């Protein structure tokens, strides 16, 4: 049954919420209230009602009326933003941060991760449950991935921009119901979703109506959309394969499991000899090597750092990178190599907390199953201007020249802009979006850190962070 938009709006305000108080991991804002809720979302065609939900991790005082809603990027989960959010609400106590958990995160089975976080299973048991079993002959209980046939049956091939935007509309409606200001932000592909939402046609009203600001964290929408032929070809190809994106060439759910297990082991068993390194299927590019190119034994922390740090992380994982320090260093004789975080922008342990959901129950910062349809659809947003590809894909991001002139925009880039050239330029995308609607230049803040920040440094850098130093006054000035 399809729910009307008015029904969805009412559901957003009086949402079917399952509130779970989540333990706040230590740090500068450990007193911040953190809770997760699931709301009834958009009734997507072909999707069972149990999956027509959208999650939110809410950080900050329940008395705060202003809300920054943040949409994750490709293969990102809501917990990724929690360390940043705790810091923000400590600096701007009149605000809450709501980190979106897209519907596909309902497919994850986090029970064993929760046990590991509570110390109820060993590191070896935890790793074996999610990955190690793949090379072991015994039949002990282990993680069972969602089958391609089941995902297809549940409509996952249709979880594109329309589904993401309609689910987000529920979240925005709930945030507006608090009576304060609402700002929508997004990281990476989440920035494309921000543009799509702001310019979307909701029964004649554009999504930006009632929003005070937009925040683009190294992401946005190119003004040059895909062609109709390209959109048709992408849909045809998707119809014959898994609904899930193989991000960086690594199929689902393996990339998400690599991220989750690697970060959790780095966080909870950092000095132990690497479990992943002893697992035969681990790709060579994720195995620590010395400067001469020889593989070296390393700790869990060092193995995780090697895979995400600029300088050792491979180009196909640029979207996972941070500046986490100098890298792996040799320890004593017979000891595994360890991590040297000297000079880090994003401390490696902080990044491990972001990706593993440290101290939180039932969530992590990685998305194990990410629908490829959302990436296909993102190419047609075209900064919110009508184009033939949108018609092919069923998108309504058409009000790109009609945004309120009162809207404020903040955008920050990273080294990805230099890697991908003019085809990917966060600041130009944001500036162009503002110019289309004659938003005054004084309302637009552009932060250029492409010479120093990796893709995840804006969200992870601590205690010095160019993004935070601009975001806090941006929010408080609205």
Sequence positions of predicted segments:
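C-terminal subdomain of alpha/beta-hydrolase-fold enzymes, centered on the catalytic histidine
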Residues: 101, 294-478
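Gly/Ala-rich beta-loop-alpha elbow adjacent to hydrolase catalytic centers
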Residues: 185-190, 194
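Bacterial N-terminal signal peptides
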Residues: 12-23
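Alpha/beta-hydrolase-fold enzymes
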Residues: 207-212, 218-353
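Short, surface-exposed "cap/lid" segments of acyl-processing enzymes
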Residues: 60-132
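N-terminal cap/lid segment of alpha/beta-hydrolase-fold proteins
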Residues: 32-61
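Alpha/beta-hydrolase active-site loop
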Residues: 117-176
